[in-house]
Structures are given as structure tokens and as C-alpha cells.
Amino acid sequence: MDRTICPFFIQSFTMSTALKRLIPFLVPFVVFLVAAALGGLAADQPENHQALAEPVTGVGEAGVSPVNEAGESYSSATSGVQEATAPGAVLLDAIDAESDKVDNQAEGGERMKKVEEELSLLRRELYDRTDRPGLKRAVILSLATSAAIGGRMVSRTLRDNIPGYFVVINAILAAYYIRKVLTYRRRVMTKRQPFMSSVKNFFRRKPKDEGAGVDKASKKQT
């Protein structure tokens, strides 16, 4: 007897390498079959079945209430009195919120207009009380440029001693300050905007009218 069993175990432990590689794949498959069989047996027990006449637990409890075809929710005995909510109420709330937003924007626009008016008054007062900046520099540079040009035209010595770039630089600076003096009123009385901000505003898209959505929603409601 022992001589027959021992060679069997020895032969089973010395099986081929290919069969040993199949064992890790066969074991999970066998476990799955056993678990499925046990689950089927447990489901066939009569204790797990529920009569059709009995109400299903959970319905009407914990604030769960049935809903009719119109979308209104009825109050249940356990959840207390509940208000019926119609789908149109949600749309009306959205329209009211949008109208409030438009009103707030209109109030903000009126405030901005008042602020701009106050700033314009301050600019006018600044223009009346202050002298034009750069006026003295414009006069001095203009006189220096005119004297250098006249001296180079009259005297050969001044032509050799005064370089041409000196006259050009003085002429450019004089023109800059003359322009600054002449445009002082416009720069003070109007709102100034930085160069980069003006470039960004030029390429920026204009926002759409937010009130158009409210008008469309009101038309649909009517």
C-alpha cells in the first residue's frame, strides 16, 4: 500500500514545468466557480424572498416622497409636510437672479459716471491752478536751436565748432516740449490711458450684452 502511494506523490511533485505554470491560472478559476455555486445556493433560500404584497422598505421614509407626472412632489406621512415645487418656479428664480444682476450693473454704471464727472472737475481745477509744464524748456531749446542754426550759417568758425548732431538733438527736444505744451489742456481734461492698456483693449473682444439672455428667457416664459 505504501509502496503504491509514495510513487504517486513523488510523481505528482515532479510534474512537468508547463503544467506547473498552469496552476496559478487554474486556482483562481476554481475559486470563482466555488464562490458562484455558494452564492446561488444562498439565493435559493426562502428567507431571502419577499412577498409581493408587502411594501418595499425604504419608500416613504427618510424624506423620500413619490413624484407625479407634473413634477410635483407629494408629502409623505413620515417626512412631514412638504411644499410642491413646479418646474416653472426654477425658471422664474433664474430670471429674477439675472434681473437683479442687471440692476446691480446699472447702479455700478451710474456710480462710474459720477466718479468720472468728479475727476473731470478735478482735472479742470488742476489745469486752472497749475502752469503748463515744459514751457521754459521748450523756449530755451527753441532759442538754442535757432542760435546754433544761425551761427552755423553766418560764421564758419561756429560751423566747425558746433557739430550737426547737436543741432538735430536740440531740434528734436524742442519739438517734443512744444508738443507737450500745446497738448497740455487735452491731456489734463481727458482721461489718460497707458500705452499697453490701450493695445490690450484694442485686441480685446467686446463683451456680449448680458441682458439679452434675460429678455429671451422672459419671452419663452410668456
UniProtKB/Swiss-Prot annotation:
Name the UniProt record assigns to this protein: Dense granule protein 3
Positions occupied by motif Prevents secretion from ER: 219-222
Membrane topology annotation: Multi-pass membrane protein
Species of the source: Toxoplasma gondii
Subunit-level organization: Homodimer. Interacts (via N-terminus) with human host CAMLG (via N-terminus).
Any one of the GO CC terms: cytoplasm
Signal peptide positions on this chain: none
Subcellular location: Cytoplasm; Host endoplasmic reticulum; Parasitophorous vacuole membrane
Domain of life: Eukaryota
Purpose of the protein: Direct host-parasite interaction occurs at the cytoplasmic faces of the parasitophorous vacuole membrane (PVM) and the host endoplasmic reticulum (ER) membrane via GRA3 and host CAMLG association. Direct insertion of GRA3 ER retrieval motif into the host ER membrane contributes to the host ER recruitment to the PVM.
Entry note about domains: The KKXX motif functions as an ER retrieval signal that rationalizes association with PVM and the host cell ER.
Spans traversing the lipid bilayer: 22-42, 162-182
Keywords assigned by UniProt, alphabetized: Cytoplasm, Host endoplasmic reticulum, Membrane, Transmembrane, Transmembrane helix
Upper lineage: Eukaryota, Sar, Alveolata, Apicomplexa, Conoidasida
